[in-house]
A protein has these predicted regions:
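Intrinsically disordered, low-complexity tandem-repeat regions enriched in Proline and Serine
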Residues: 6, 12-15
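Low-complexity, intrinsically disordered or signal/transmembrane-proximal segments
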Residues: 8-9, 24
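Iron-sulfur-associated redox domains of electron-transfer enzymes in respiratory
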Residues: 14-194
């Protein structure tokens, strides 16, 4: 008697063989990377994973990344997200809250995400108004006028903050930038165990 279950299939060459259950390959993880206020060095280090990127492609779909997709909105149900950079603009603030809400494991990716690092150096200069006055007034040589309208450029926050000061972080991956081997060591167990 033939099985009517579409997930079971007997051997058509030997009808006496019992039907075998077909197994689905494990679902791929949904991986994202985000670039906030930083230099993109962490993403360049991610690309230094070289041949392991092929294995990564078997384990995960990259659903959002400035270096691997042109998607404009952060998707729902992301398993792992590497967040590069500190939070320094109004857009960064909106995005990091959305990332945390839609991501199972959020990784602070590199020193700027962990401590605000180089972008955070402006925090000691008296606030964003003082920084802009110096940049566009005191030291400007060509255009010594502060722009009145920022247009499509997001509003700068008064300070650049590390990610953990705004949302919970699940894993810290230090380095400026973290090495490719360190990135792999952080991702590999998560991709297999989540």
């Amino acid at each position: 008697m033939e099985s009517t279950n579409p997930k079971q299939q007997g051997n058509p060459m030997n009808p006496k063989d019992p039907p075998k259950t077909l197994t689905q390959p494990p679902a791929k993880k949904r991986l994202a990377t985000v670039w906030l206020t930083g230099c993109s060095g962490c993403h360049m280090s991610f690309l230094d994973l070289d041949e392991w990127l092929f294995e990564l492609a078997d384990l995960a779909d990259i659903v959002y990344s400035p270096v691997a997709s042109d998607r404009k909105t952060y998707p729902k149900a992301v398993d792992i997200c590497l967040v590069e950079g500190g939070v320094g603009t109004s857009d960064n603030l909106r995005l990091i809250r959305q990332v945390r809400q839609r991501t199972r494991v959020l990784i602070a990716f590199g020193d700027c995400a962990i401590t605000a690092n180089v972008p955070g150096m402006r925090n000691n200069l008296g606030g964003i108004d003082a920084v802009l006055a110096t940049a566009y007034g005191t030291t400007a040589q060509v255009f010594s006028q502060l722009p009145e309208d920022s247009g499509p450029v997001p509003k700068l926050l008064d300070q650049v903050l590390p990610v953990h000061e705004l949302v919970p972080v699940d894993l810290y991956l230090p380095g400026c930038p973290p090495s490719a081997s360190r990135i792999r060591a952080a991702l590999e167990p998560l991709l297999h165990d989540l």
